[in-house]
Amino acid sequence: MNEDITPKKPNAIIEWIDYRLPIFAFLKHFSHYQTPKNLNYLWNLGSIAGIALVIQIITGVILAMHYTPHVDHAFDSVERIMRNVNYGWLLRYTHAVGASMFFAAVYLHIARGLYYGSYKAPRELLWHIGIIIFLTMMATAFMGYVLPWGQMSYWGATVITNLFSAIPLIGEFIVTWLWGGFSVDNPTLNRFFSLHYLLPFIIVALVMLHLVALHQHGSNNPKGIDVKSPKDTIPFHPYYTVKDFVGFGVYFIIFAYFIFYEPNYLGHPDNYIPANPLVTPAHIVPEWYFLPFYAILRAMPSKLGGVLLMFGSIFVLFLLPWLDTSKVRSSNYRPIYRMAFWIFMADCLLLGYLGGQPAEEPYITISRFAACYYFFHVLVALPLIGKYEKPLPLPEEL
């Protein structure tokens, strides 16, 4: 029997829409997008972070329908969501745990980029947009942490906003402007609620830019070499969509475990106490994803020095494409840098641990050494290793 090979006639309605708004052509581009054939499961993390962002926006919008941004009612409105709103407990825990899962995916995404040199030419702007997304996430998460108006929310807002007072000449003015008064109060809560609602949509716009930059030169790969021929690539769909769904399955299993069994494991019990400006908690601790930077902040005895180091530890990431002088991207072919990378990862984990400890000895001294190594790795070790390291021979093809 002869097989009918007549091409399928396109749908007239789809053609009409596509001519005016090429949304179907855009989706076709995504499904036929050529991707390096050797990507491993670490390349799932971008898609996982995208799913996490969608979950945060959906749950956040629904929670905002029941939340009251007023210092006299905010704490009670959160408790009412937990007790009286249908599945309110699930919405709140999904949103709270989802923030941690989002940051976990992004931190692993950044670590993968550092290991495989995804910040190197021609992907510098892709890396920079990613760091801007990370900064916007931090601002969004900080403001969201204030909204339940518990003890840790109030005092966390007080401590972090007070950091701007370290800026010479204009610091006090900035703090008063942020507060909308002379202390953290109702205007502060309203501003933070408004910005917390707005910033996720700005993150979506930045993610779109991130994807445009990604599609300009394509994904990096574990070997860190450029695609040289069509045989080095495969279509994104179905090969990597199926692989992504495996990653989603693992992600949602971990996500569900924390929601249903340990929803408050990553939080702080003091935030179940209503905010009281007259009682300072014994130990003010931010969320876990801020702890490494909090440790760097506390490592400096001077307030201004700590603020500069904390922000510098993030902004220095913008310089990585030029600080790393090696022509080889992947750490698989850079034995010395690979060792330095894992020491750097251990240092970041140590800073995270130290950020959660009381501001006393020996934690302060260890924090100083760990903060020094953080900057030493990025500003000194990275350029020197790239200059003097002898990499292994690179393969000719994927």
From Swiss-Prot:
Membrane-related topology note: Multi-pass membrane protein
Domain of life according to the entry: Bacteria
CDD domains: cytochrome_b_C, Cytochrome_b_N
Major site of localization recorded for this protein: membrane
Transmembrane segments annotated in the record for this chain: 45-65, 96-116, 129-149, 164-184, 192-212, 245-265, 277-297, 304-324, 339-359, 366-386
InterPro entries: Cyt_b/b6_C, Cyt_b/b6_C_sf, Cyt_b/b6_N, Cytb/b6-like_sf, Cytochrome_b, Cytochrome_b_C_euk/bac, Cytochrome_b_N_euk/bac, Di-haem_cyt_TM
GO molecular function: metal ion binding; ubiquinol-cytochrome-c reductase activity
Quaternary structure (record): The main subunits of complex b-c1 are: cytochrome b, cytochrome c1 and the Rieske protein.
Family: Belongs to the cytochrome b family.
Protein name per UniProt: Cytochrome b
Organism this protein belongs to: Rickettsia conorii (strain ATCC VR-613 / Malish 7)
Top-level taxonomy: Bacteria, Pseudomonadati, Pseudomonadota, Alphaproteobacteria, Rickettsiales
